[in-house]
């Protein structure tokens, strides 16, 4: 069984036992998170939401908070001696999906 949830402005396909990386949530490691915005539940009994499946939830345990690898943003204008170098590390939350309740 799998489900498609919406979190952080993105839609993510999840299965029980799967580890996922999502946009940072304001929770501590070890806590349990419940997602109510379940858009689709697949498997033997397929349920499609409009826009969400009523009564369906996905529970996951927070494994850790972290920051992704650094990316470098470099802007310049030719012939103007105008240069800007900037780095960015996106914060994330790593979850392990425990159950899909549909």
Swiss-Prot record:
Stored Pfam families: Ribosomal_L21p
GO BP field: translation
Record flagged with keyword Repeat: no
One MF annotation (Gene Ontology) recorded for this entry: structural constituent of ribosome
GO cellular component: cytoplasm; ribonucleoprotein complex; ribosome
Presence of keyword Glycoprotein: no
InterPro entries for the chain: bL21-like, bL21-like_sf, Ribosomal_bL21, Ribosomal_bL21_CS
TM ranges: none
Keywords: Ribonucleoprotein, Ribosomal protein, RNA-binding, rRNA-binding
NCBIfam families reported in the protein's UniProt record: L21
Family (UniProt): Belongs to the bacterial ribosomal protein bL21 family.
Subunit architecture: Part of the 50S ribosomal subunit. Contacts protein L20.
Function of the molecule: This protein binds to 23S rRNA in the presence of protein L20.
Protein name: Large ribosomal subunit protein bL21
Organism: Bacillus cereus (strain ATCC 14579 / DSM 31 / CCUG 7414 / JCM 2152 / NBRC 15305 / NCIMB 9373 / NCTC 2599 / NRRL B-3711)
